[in-house]
Amino acid sequence: DGTLGAHTATGAIVSESSMGVAVPMSMPNYRSYFGRSVEISYGGRTVVAVVNDCGGLGGGSRALDLQPGVWKALGASSCFDWGVRTVSYRFL
């Protein structure tokens, strides 16, 4: 998600270990999700991340944009390795 070292919509700095996600700006009241935890599952792994950003996300065709710590925890070695995948998620 974003560029390493960049600030998210909530002011967090994106790093290799960032456990944040972005929600689409097309989501109604998307700002109300900032600070909420979201449980994300893929391939038998489950992680909890925090909504700290927003974006276009493929014109609204994607539900979440994962920061590096999240996709690494779900088993990917790089952003290019992760790409676009279907995950299960729920807001906590």
Residue ranges of predicted features:
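Secreted/periplasmic proteins
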Residues: 1-92
